[in-house]
A protein has these predicted regions:
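Extended charged
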Residues: 1-8, 27-30, 55, 63-149
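Short, charged surface segments at domain edges that flank catalytic/cofactor-binding sites
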Residues: 1-23, 48
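Flanking scaffold residues of small Cys/His-coordinated metal-binding clusters
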Residues: 16, 32, 49-53, 82
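Short beta-strand-alpha-helix junction that forms the catalytic/metal-binding core
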Residues: 21, 45-65
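Short recognition patches in nucleic-acid-associated and regulatory proteins
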Residues: 31-41
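Short edge-strand/loop segments of extracellular domains
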Residues: 39-40, 45, 74-76
Length: 149
């Protein structure tokens, strides 16, 4: 069951996140479903309702993340933590492809998060492409891979 946070808390989280999903960096303004408040560390795993444990998340990222905080890397045989927007900077783990359609991992944490949340599923890539044509993606100031021709 989803917890209801006060409008003041929700507003503070939205402003802090620049109205972006803190995982996939979709802009809430253009989404058909309002973003949700995510517990970075789920309550079931010892997380709490403090602002230091809350993140703005689109419906899809929140649903895919669920209670996950890490995933098993089968090649390495170890758990890799997912990106924690309260402790880490997005640009340290991710960069947009030169065309802005795909999120590229820069680290194992980025790779694990992209896989767990399915950040580059076909439908969202198509939506990003349409948003690029409308000049509303990628987000202003977002790190973009250099085009190497």
């Amino acid at each position: 069951m989803s917890k209801k946070f006060s409008s003041v808390i929700q507003s503070e989280i939205r402003v802090r996140a620049n109205y972006l999903c803190e995982y996939c960096h979709a802009l809430e303004k253009w989404q058909y479903v309002a973003f949700t408040i995510d517990h970075v560390i789920p309550l079931t795993q010892g997380g709490d309702d403090s602002l230091d444990n809350l993140a703005l998340a689109c419906f899809h990222c929140n649903r895919r993340k669920g209670n996950l905080v890490s995933i098993k890397d089968l090649a390495l045989g170890e758990d890799i933590p997912l990106f924690n927007p309260r402790r880490e900077r997005w640009q340290d783990h991710f960069i947009w492809s030169a065309d802005g359609r795909v999120i590229i991992s820069l680290t194992a944490v980025g790779k694990a998060t992209i896989a767990a949340l399915d950040l580059n599923r076909e439908r969202v890539i198509d939506i990003r492409q349409a948003d690029i044509l409308l000049k509303r993606h990628p987000p202003p100031g977002a790190p973009i891979q250099e085009n190497v021709d």
